[in-house]
Amino acid sequence: GLLAVASQANADFIKPGVITAGSDITFAPYEYMLNGQPAGFDIEMLKGIAASLGKTSVNVDTRFPNLIPGLQGKRFDITNSSMYITAERLKVIDMIPYLKTGEKIVTLSDSKYKPEDPAEMCGHKIGTMAGTSFLQGLMKFSQDSCVAKGKPAITISEYPTDPQVTQALLSKAVEAQITDVAVAQGVVQRLKGRVVITSDKLLYPVLIGFGVRKDDPVVKKAMEEGLSKFSKTTQYKQLFEKYHFTPVTAEDIKTIKAS
């Protein structure tokens, strides 16, 4: 009986004993390459979850817009790529929340233009990574709050990866970059003061989750169980402290999902 259950539990994972994840490994500090190996918060998080299930984890480097199609095409068991939980995404996949975050605005330190929120972006060139969840919100804002009120639209430039957006900012192809708060902090540190964060408050607060296929209850249940087990460990607490990140509370799940 037990053996049958064990083999059943492995049946829905691509490789027995392994959680295969799709990750866009260009997005420090969540997932990035370090000495030829995937590193970062999401990578360590999944390792901890896998270990608590007696499994190992593998991250398959995949560009962000290809993650959901890859998941649906069974190239991997889950997506593990700091993916924001949105109503749009929940129509096509299920998501398991594990982190709370939001966006910040970054500009060159010596720029006169230092917007604090999208209201100051009408008529300006803004750079962002393609496929991000807040893009629709920004486009809608440009239409409803800029154009409809007789102001020039926000010019939004999309780039394949986040570092390319920062490059565009440095070369003045865009005037500001909107990116995840943790990524923004990393960019400021890495560029040693060449860029600054100009927004105080978190824009578009969201939950981040692992993506799982809707028709795959085995993987979903295993991930939820692994996360629950891992969250009770010191290692989990230390992981959040190391990255200065915020774990998800039951309250967050209620309020942010409602919004």
What are these regions (language model features)?
Residues 11-82, 158, 223, 238, ...:
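Extracytoplasmic small-molecule ligand-binding "clamshell" domains
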Residues 43-52, 111, 119-133, 209-248:
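Extended ligand-binding regions for polar small-molecule ligands
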Residues 47-54, 134-158, 188-192:
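Ligand-binding cleft/hinge of the Venus flytrap
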Residues 66, 82-91, 137-141, 170-204:
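A ligand-binding cleft/hinge motif common to bilobed small-molecule-binding domains
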